[in-house]
Amino acid sequence: LDHSKDKNESNNRAERVISHALVEMRRLSWWPFGIKSAVLLDVSENGFKIEFTGKADYSQGEQLVLSIPLSPFGISAPRAISIPVEVVWFDKEKMRCGGIFKNNDPAVVIFVRKIMEVSKGI
């Protein structure tokens, strides 16, 4: 067996960076109820991992909106970016969730890259 390959390289995962930004998970971007706060643990161009600050319960395949405030990343406008996401996994014990970004909008990609760039320096 050849163990010389990096773990990320061997399973073709996108580069991920660690973050500690507070984010919100919503059912709909405009709906002010049922918002769950979470800590963004890591992010890549394809997806994310978060840990909720309180109780939450989501299912695999659920379509949600992840709202990421941009000021902690040195971006003054817009205030936040809301990205449609799909839940890939949810851990009820750890209150953690991982998912993928559903929107390939070039603006979203630019903001996610900026978040990753700033997070690398933390």
Region spans (language model):
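Short, conserved beta-turn/loop elements at beta-strand boundaries and strand-helix junctions
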Residues: E45-N46, F90-M95
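Short, Lys/Arg- and Gly-enriched loop/turn segments at beta-strand edges
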Residues: S71-S82
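Short beta-strand-centered aromatic/proline hotspots
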Residues: K36-A38, I81-V88
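N-terminal helix initiation/capping motif
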Residues: L1-E45, E51, M116-I122
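Short coil-to-beta transition motif at edge beta-strands of beta-rich domains
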Residues: I18-E24, G54-P72
